[in-house]
């Protein structure tokens, strides 16, 4: 039987989602819990592998089990054992051919920034602090330029190993908040550090160091050296996972390009 688990976690005290040799990770917490229940190792498969310090409002993983436990009891058993910075929101059964990673057709990230004269220790780890005044309208107009299908070679880590760096963004916008702004971006998928590089670039636009007209040129150049900065993980949230094409079409229209990840080799 294949089980789908929806979770949320606060990423400050994790080295990321994926198992690490030395260090606390989200995957480690769940596989340790499931091993105790099954008396054997149980591998979990996530929809996304968040990095160190990145939070998740909605994340999924699946695993296979032979245990005959009601769904409500799965949720109760997990939450009773898990630490306070992880929570299981829902547990359901899925078809045996369902795969959390390859059936994912879209993801939304939110990057939170607060602006003030001084750093607020109570925001530490939850939002990124930027003291400078930024042109948010200009940043938003630059952000809109990324909507569509592009090769994001110049806007991801040079450590990115996947062959195709073409991704489709359905949403890319700066939203003003009471104490700063959020960058919200929804796409078919994201390359390693892609969201953080986009944020860093948009902040440079807000400071007047880049123009809106630079976006097409930088996409065309495919040169990471032209966009050298990466925003910190602090303030980055995996906000939503789309496992249903119809939900994605409902949110962004029937004309969008859907990337079916069962034909891709990247998360």
Swiss-Prot record:
Q: Which UniProt keywords apply?
A: Isomerase, tRNA processing
The Gene Ontology biological process terms listed for this entry are: tRNA pseudouridine synthesis
Kindly list the GO molecular function terms attached to this UniProt entry.
RNA binding; tRNA pseudouridine(38-40) synthase activity
**What does the entry list as the binding residues for substrate?**
109
Q: Which InterPro entries match?
A: PsdUridine_synth_cat_dom_sf (IPR020103), PsdUridine_synth_TruA (IPR001406), PsdUridine_synth_TruA_a/b_dom (IPR020097), PsdUridine_synth_TruA_C (IPR020095), TruA/RsuA/RluB/E/F_N (IPR020094)
Does the keyword field hold tRNA processing?
yes
In terms of Pfam families, this protein maps to: PseudoU_synth_1
Q: Which family is annotated?
A: Belongs to the tRNA pseudouridine synthase TruA family.
NCBIfam families in UniProt: hisT_truA
The protein's assembly and partners: Homodimer.
Q: What is this protein called?
A: tRNA pseudouridine synthase A
Q: What is the lineage of its organism?
A: Bacteria, Bacillati, Bacillota, Bacilli, Bacillales
């Amino acid at each position: 039987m294949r089980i789908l688990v929806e979770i949320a976690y606060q990423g400050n005290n994790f080295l990321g989602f994926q198992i690490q040799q030395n260090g606390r990770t989200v995957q480690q917490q769940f596989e340790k819990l499931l091993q105790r229940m099954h008396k054997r190792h149980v591998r979990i498969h996530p929809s996304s592998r968040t990095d160190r310090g990145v939070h998740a409002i909605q994340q999924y993983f699946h695993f296979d089990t032979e245990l005959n436990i009601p769904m409500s009891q799965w949720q109760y058993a997990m939450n009773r054992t898990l630490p306070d910075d992880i929570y299981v929101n829902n547990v359901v059964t899925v078809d045996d051919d369902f795969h959390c990673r390859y059936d994912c057709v879209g993801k939304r990230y939110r990057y939170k920034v607060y602006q003030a004269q001084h750093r607020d220790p109570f925001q530490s780890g939850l939002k990124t602090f930027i003291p400078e005044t930024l042109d948010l309208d200009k940043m938003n107009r630059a952000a809109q330029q990324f909507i569509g299908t592009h090769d994001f070679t110049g806007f991801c880590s040079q450590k990115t190993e996947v062959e195709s760096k073409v991704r489709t963004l359905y949403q890319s916008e700066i939203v003003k908040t009471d104490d700063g702004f959020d960058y919200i971006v929804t796409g078919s998928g994201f390359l390693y550090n892609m969201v953080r590089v986009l944020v860093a670039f948009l902040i440079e636009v807000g400071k007047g160091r880049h123009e809106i007209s630079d976006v097409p040129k930088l996409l065309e150049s495919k040169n990471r050296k032209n966009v050298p900065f990466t925003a910190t993980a602090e303030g980055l949230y995996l906000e939503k996972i789309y496992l249903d094409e119809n939900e994605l079409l409902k949110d962004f229209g029937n004309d969008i390009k859907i990337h079916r990840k069962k034909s891709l080799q990247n998360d």
